[in-house]
Curated annotation (Swiss-Prot):
<keyword id="KW-0489">Methyltransferase</keyword>
<feature type="binding site">
    <location>
        <position position="222"/>
    </location>
    <ligand>
        <name>S-adenosyl-L-methionine</name>
    </ligand>
</feature>
<dbReference type="InterPro" id="IPR010280">
    <property type="entry name" value="U5_MeTrfase_fam"/>
</dbReference>
<dbReference type="GO" id="GO:0000049">
    <property type="term" value="F:tRNA binding"/>
</dbReference>
<comment type="similarity">
    <text>Belongs to the class I-like SAM-binding methyltransferase superfamily. RNA M5U methyltransferase family. TrmA subfamily.</text>
</comment>
<dbReference type="GO" id="GO:0005829">
    <property type="term" value="C:cytosol"/>
</dbReference>
<dbReference type="GO" id="GO:0030488">
    <property type="term" value="P:tRNA methylation"/>
</dbReference>
<protein>
    <recommendedName>
        <fullName>tRNA/tmRNA (uracil-C(5))-methyltransferase</fullName>
        <ecNumber>2.1.1.-</ecNumber>
        <ecNumber>2.1.1.35</ecNumber>
    </recommendedName>
</protein>
<dbReference type="InterPro" id="IPR029063">
    <property type="entry name" value="SAM-dependent_MTases_sf"/>
</dbReference>
<keyword id="KW-0808">Transferase</keyword>
<dbReference type="InterPro" id="IPR030391">
    <property type="entry name" value="MeTrfase_TrmA_CS"/>
</dbReference>
<keyword id="KW-0819">tRNA processing</keyword>
<feature type="binding site">
    <location>
        <position position="298"/>
    </location>
    <ligand>
        <name>S-adenosyl-L-methionine</name>
    </ligand>
</feature>
<dbReference type="Pfam" id="PF05958">
    <property type="entry name" value="tRNA_U5-meth_tr"/>
</dbReference>
<comment type="function">
    <text>Dual-specificity methyltransferase that catalyzes the formation of 5-methyluridine at position 54 (m5U54) in all tRNAs, and that of position 341 (m5U341) in tmRNA (transfer-mRNA).</text>
</comment>
<feature type="binding site">
    <location>
        <position position="217"/>
    </location>
    <ligand>
        <name>S-adenosyl-L-methionine</name>
    </ligand>
</feature>
<dbReference type="GO" id="GO:0030697">
    <property type="term" value="F:tRNA (uracil(54)-C5)-methyltransferase activity, S-adenosyl methionine-dependent"/>
</dbReference>
Length: 365
């Protein structure tokens, strides 16, 4: 991470640089004007991870700066939420004099929400015993006088929870309050306010939809739940078990009755749809009964594999959220043969980095 680049006074310039770069990158495609969704210039990250440095009686957070090729002390961290920045000094001052809690502590992770919850994970190079548990309970009680906080201790093959290993985010999305169960150590969108803009964009591009929606790589149901209002039914796939469990929680708490989650990979689902293989996980689910005119994909950095690209081309409308514009380019080389890009967006999830989150909406030619 290049900590020196994180200067809010340069935010607009760096965003414009990304806008120009993304526009030029896709110049060979007939794209509409790029819609650009900005981030807050500071305090935008809902999660942060720090290594812990021990120096005599002192103890502090640090990160590794790749530009300086050295560790940098982080008493505060500008990109992290205000809640994380408030927690950082409060926590470290309680850890410093506590020989049990600080011993062999090597990392601290924070997961916060816009709605005011924070989860703190303490990671150790030692086994956690009853004495540690007693001190951790006291730490949690002390922090709870100032914060809506939960605490986790982690060591090799150990995970001790006080009292929850998740937070519940509450987001106002297009005038509707949505709640999202976000579990520790699993993927969630890091930039809460930009995540809302992404959800609202996806709702807008699919607002006149008919039939059903298929989503691949649905995670904790982030998009599926927001988009369910635009479709008769939603069928979504996700492989990671913790994410599927979070998605089921989110379906229930948001009272979404037209969304079905299947725990399987996009590649396996592609084979099932092509009737190349049958899967026990699909027993009782009649895939042929779904009338999916729209498909939503938010793949990992590697993008869509060739078979999934072929599957996606079979749908009238495609919503593609990409965390890697280069693999999106590769996929669009095929998708553009059958579909036309009618919406194109840049979401600045990660200010002051080269990372560009983008969205395209394609309709069959």
């Amino acid at each position: 991470m290049n900590l020196a680049a994180m200067d809010p006074t340069t935010y607009d310039v760096q965003l414009e640089t990304k806008r120009v770069k993304l526009t030029q990158l896709f110049a060979d495609f007939d794209t509409p004007e790029l819609e650009t969704f900005s981030s807050e210039p500071a305090h935008y990250r809902m999660r942060a991870e720090f290594r812990v440095w021990h120096e005599g009686e002192d103890l502090y957070y640090y990160m590794f700066d790749k530009e300086l090729n050295s560790k940098v002390r982080c008493d505060q961290f500008l990109p992290a939420s205000e809640l994380i920045n408030k927690m950082m000094p409060a926590l470290v001052e309680l850890l410093k004099p506590n020989t049990i809690l600080r011993h062999r502590l090597f990392q601290i992770d924070f997961l916060s929400t816009l709605s005011g919850e924070i989860l703190v994970s303490l990671l150790y190079h030692k086994q956690l015993d009853s004495e540690w548990e007693q001190q951790a309970k006291i730490l949690k009680q002390t922090l709870s006088t100032q914060f809506n906080v939960n605490l986790i201790g982690r060591a090799r093959k150990q995970k001790i929870i006080f009292d929850k290993d998740f937070v519940v985010e509450s987001l106002n999305v297009a005038g509707k309050q949505l709640q999202y169960h976000q579990i520790e150590n699993s993927f969630t969108q890091p930039n809460g306010k930009v995540s809302v803009k992404m959800l609202e964009w996806a709702i807008d591009v699919t607002k006149n939809s008919t039939g059903d929606l298929l989503e691949l790589y649905c995670g904790n149901g982030n998009f599926s739940i927001a988009l369910a209002q635009n479709f008769d039914r939603v069928l979504a796939t996700e492989l990671a078990k913790p994410s599927v469990e979070s998605a089921q929680y989110n379906i229930k708490v948001n009272q979404v009755e037209n969304l079905q989650i299947i725990r399987m990979s996009a590649e396996d689902f592609t084979e099932a749809m092509a009737k190349k293989r049958s899967f026990r996980r699909l027993e009782g689910i009649d895939l042929d009964s779904y009338n999916c005119n729209t498909i939503f994909v938010d793949p990992p950095r590697a993008g869509l594999d060739a078979d999934t690209v072929k599957l996606v081309q079979g749908y009238e409308r495609i919503v593609y959220i990409s965390c890697n514009p280069h693999t999106l380019l590769d996929n669009l080389a095929e998708l553009s043969k059958t579909h036309k890009i009618t919406r194109f967006a840049l979401f600045d999830q990660f200010p002051y980095t080269d990372h560009m989150e983008s969205g395209v909406f394609l309709e069959k030619r």
